[in-house]
Swiss-Prot record:
Mg(2+) 1 binds at residues 191, 195. The gene is ilvC. This is Ketol-acid reductoisomerase (NADP(+)). Pfam families: KARI_C, KARI_N. NADP(+) binds at residues 25-28, 49, 51, 83-86, 134.
Length: 332
C-alpha cells in the first residue's frame, strides 16, 4: 500500500528562501502558481510574452517573464508545459541556465521516464502531480481544502529532494488531502495505461460499439445515444462518489443483475489480453517512441483520427440532443 503524507509531514520553510518558477501558466500552472503565492512563497511565472497565459499570471499578481529569464532566476523550476513541447524548451531555454542545487519539478513523468529530458547530475528531480484539474486544485485550496497529489523523487542531489517536494505539495494544498508516494515510472506507466485502456480509449470505443450495435439492429440513433452515451455520466458520477457498490446499490435490481451477469462477456479474456499488450507497449517504451515520432511529424495520425471521430454519427446525434438540454452548457 502507498505511503501517504499529510500536513504535519511537510514544512513550507524548506522553500522560504527559494524562488519557484512555474513554466507554463496553463491549466495546472495557474492553480499551482496562485496557490504557492497564497502560501507565502516567492513565485514567478513564465509563458509566451503577452499571451493570454502571460496576462492571466499578471492578473493573479505574479511576476511574469520569459522562460530563459525565469530559469536564470529560479531555484525550483516546475515544468508544466504539454509533454510534446517540454524537451525542446528544456534544451533551449532551461538547461543552459541550470545551476548546482537547482530543483527540476514536473507534474507528469513522461519525459523523464522515457529519457526525453536528461537533467544534469547536480540538480534534484522531483514530481508533484495533483490528481485533479487545475481549476479544482485552485478552488479546493481557496476553500481551505486540497486535492490529493502524487510525489516522487528521481534524482536527489541535495539529499533533501523529498522534503522539498513535500513542501511544494503542501504549498499547493495537496497535503491537506493526502500525498501518495510513487515513482516516475509508476506514475507515467499507470497514467498512460488508464488513458488508453479505459478513461479515454476504452470508454469511447465501448460507447461507439454499443451505439453502432443498437443502430445496426434498427433502433433509432437518438434512443441509442441516450443508452450508450448520455447516461454514462449518471453511472460514473455514482462510482466517483462512492465506489462500485454505491453504483450497484443505486441502480435498479434489473440493471444490477444484468450488469453483473453480462459485464464479463464484454471485458472477457481477449480484452484482458489486449490490456496486457497495451501495458507492455507502454512499459517497453514502444508507445513513447510512437508518440514522439508522431509529434515530430506534426501529428498526422492524431489529426486523421480526430477527423474520423468528428464525422461519426454519434457526434451528429449527440449535438442535436444536447441542444435540447441547455443545462449541460451551464457553468456551475
Amino acid at each position: 500500500m502507498a505511503t501517504i503524507y499529510r500536513d504535519k509531514d511537510a514544512d513550507l520553510r524548506v522553500l522560504k528562501d527559494k524562488t519557484i518558477a512555474i513554466i507554463g501558466y496553463g491549466n495546472q500552472g495557474h492553480a499551482q502558481g496562485a496557490n504557492l503565492k497564497d502560501s507565502g512563497l516567492d513565485v514567478i511565472a513564465a509563458d509566451l510574452k503577452d499571451s493570454p497565459a502571460w496576462k492571466r499570471a499578471e492578473k493573479d499578481g505574479l511576476r511574469v517573464m520569459t522562460v530563459p529569464e525565469a530559469s536564470k532566476e529560479a531555484d525550483f523550476i516546475q515544468i508544466l508545459l504539454p509533454d510534446e513541447l517540454q524537451p525542446r524548451i528544456y534544451r533551449e531555454q532551461i538547461a543552459p541556465y541550470l545551476e548546482e542545487g537547482n530543483i527540476l519539478g514536473f507534474s507528469h513523468g513522461f519525459n523523464i521516464h522515457f529519457n526525453q529530458i536528461i537533467p544534469p547530475e547536480y540538480v534534484d528531480v522531483v514530481m508533484v502531480a495533483p490528481k485533479g484539474p487545475g481549476d479544482l486544485v485552485r478552488r479546493q485550496f481557496l476553500e481551505g481544502k486540497g486535492v490529493p497529489c502524487l510525489v516522487a523523487v528521481k534524482q536527489d542531489y541535495s539529499k533533501s529532494a523529498k522534503r522539498i517536494a513535500l513542501a511544494y505539495a503542501k504549498g499547493i494544498g495537496g497535503t491537506r488531502a493526502g500525498v501518495l508516494e510513487t515513482t516516475f515510472a509508476e506514475e507515467t506507466e499507470t497514467d498512460l495505461f488508464g488513458e488508453q485502456v479505459d478513461l479515454c480509449g476504452g470508454v469511447t470505443a465501448m460507447i461507439k460499439a454499443a451505439f453502432e450495435t443498437m443502430v445496426q439492429a434498427g433502433y433509432q440513433p437518438e434512443i441509442a445515444y441516450f443508452e450508450a452515451c448520455h447516461e454514462l455520466k449518471l453511472i460514473t458520477d455514482l462510482i466517483h462518489e462512492g465506489g462500485l457498490m454505491k453504483m450497484w446499490n443505486s441502480v435498479s435490481n434489473t440493471a444490477e443483475y444484468g450488469g453483473l451477469t453480462r459485464g464479463d462477456r464484454i471485458i472477457n479474456e481477449q480484452s484482458r489480453e489486449a490490456m496486457w499488450e497495451i501495458l507492455e507497449e507502454i512499459q517497453s517504451g514502444k508507445f513513447a517512441r510512437e508518440w514522439i515520432l508522431e509529434s515530430q511529424a506534426g501529428l498526422p495520425v492524431k489529426k486523421a483520427l480526430e477527423q474520423q471521430e468528428s464525422e461519426h454519427l454519434i457526434e451528429k446525434v449527440g449535438a442535436e440532443l444536447r441542444a435540447m438540454m441547455p443545462w449541460l452548457g451551464e457553468k456551475k
